Design a protein with these regions (language model features):
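Intrinsic-disorder-associated interaction segments
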Residues: 1-4, 129-133, 204, 263
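ATP-dependent helicase/translocase motor core
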Residues: 1-47
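Short glycine-rich substrate-engagement loop in P-loop NTPases that contacts/grips substrate
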Residues: 121-141
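Conserved helicase motor core of SF1/SF2 NTP-dependent helicases
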Residues: 30, 34-122, 142, 149-382
Length: 382
């Protein structure tokens, strides 16, 4: 691979042998980087601190990992922190790092980094927000005692929008980086249209605002293209947020299909759609069912089977098990993707947060998208 990469770079600099992060096996394929991706890579070389924005499928995660690869090529002893909020995406990033033997990188979800500082306390009640707040505060106290040699030379944050509303999380990342966010080296990848947390009720502290300012005044770049979705899905995703459709890979697929969400018949409609439509075209392993509702409030909550398949929660660390159908929530599945997606429990698009959840859920589909939505909803923003 190394020799092929050198040949490709010599013949055509914009060609690069890059790990395809969409593949379960991290297949290596020769791809042409888009103009915006090349621009980002050039800016990474020119700036100590860079904020990169881009919509779903624009390659933010791909570029975050490529940033780490290039750093290690130039500085093999560099200590890198690769962080995201989402547990599933964090497990995926950690797996990529292990498989590529990039031992200088500490990759994973934010709370896995907390575990690295103060130890893993095992399974906890995920709804207990006070527990997680305390974990961050304990990790922050430990991090403040680290020597410079124990801190990161480079911090790479994926899905950075998930951290903006939490000053203590930002402070922990600030402390973990040599020179902090003000003088250290960092790359911050985000999409502000994917902020799913409720509007904060309290004003940010002065320290919180100062850390946000450091992100917002840094050099910035934009990833313009959508490489994940078909034209049909990209059109639907753009419509729900009132956004212009970004240039895509010009892959055309089936039209986005919508079924009615009827009160007290939500599960029956999901089962009918899956058994009579989706499973006729796609294998269960290629399908993910996402709910707009939180854990325990999904239309399939409390059910064991669906269309003759055993319902299991999606877990990227586990291989698909025959005879099952995988389910998750929009919030948990952020940063991930699937060949076919059924997005259900779409009962409201009245708030910006509702639309953002639909935007995130819909954009997880690479080729086929099915929606189960309350009739009469306005899909066009504004």
């Amino acid at each position: 691979v190394g020799q092929l990469e050198k040949i490709a770079h010599k013949l055509r600099p914009e060609l690069r042998l890059t790990a395809n992060l969409s593949s379960e096996e991290v297949d290596l394929e020769l791809i042409r980087l888009s103009a915006s991706q090349l621009h980002v890579l050039e800016m990474l070389e020119q700036n100590k601190r860079l904020r990169v924005t881009g919509g779903p499928g624009s390659g933010k995660t791909l570029m975050a990992v490529e940033t780490c690869r290039r750093e290690l090529e130039l500085n093999p002893t560099s200590k890198i922190g690769l962080i995201c909020f989402n547990r599933f995406l964090g497990a995926f990033l950690a797996d990529v790092v292990v498989r590529e033997k990039m031992t200088q990188i500490q990759a994973g979800s934010f709370y896995s980094h907390c575990d690295g500082l103060i130890g893993n306390r095992g399974k906890v009640n995920e709804s207990d927000s006070s527990y997680f707040v305390q974990r961050v505060r304990e990790a922050l106290q430990v991090a403040k005692k680290l020597s410079p040699d124990e801190k990161y030379d480079l911090l790479v944050v994926d899905e950075g929008q998930d951290f903006r509303d939490d000053g203590e999380m930002l402070e922990l990342m600030d402390v973990l980086l040599k020179g902090g966010l003000a003088r250290g080296r960092w790359r911050w990848f985000e999409d502000l249209d994917q902020v799913l947390s409720p509007e904060p009720t309290d004003q940010p502290t002065q320290k919180h605002e100062a850390l946000l300012d450091l992100l917002d005044v840094a050099a910035s770049a934009r990833l313009e293209n959508n490489w994940r979705n078909t034209e049909q899905i990209a059109q639907a995703v753009g419509k729900v947020m009132g956004l212009p459709v970004k240039p895509t890979a010009r892959i055309f697929g089936p039209q986005v299909s919508t079924a009615p969400l009827v009160k007290d018949k939500e599960f029956a409609m999901l089962e009918a759609l899956l058994s009579k439509v989706v499973l006729k075209d796609y294998q269960p392993k290629d399908i993910i069912i996402l709910s707009m509702h939180g854990a325990g409030r999904e239309s399939y909550a409390g059910k064991d089977t669906l269309a003759g398949l055993r319902i299991v929660s999606y877990d990227p660390s586990r291989a698909y098990e025959e005879g099952t159908i995988r389910v998750s929530t929009v919030f948990k599945f952020k940063g991930m993707e699937s060949h076919a997606v059924i997005l259900t429990d779409i009962d409201s698009l009245g708030s910006v947060r509702d639309r953002r959840k639909a935007y995130v859920g819909m954009s997880r589909a690479k080729y086929a998208l099915y929606l189960i939505a309350k009739e009469g909803l306005s899909w066009g923003r504004g």
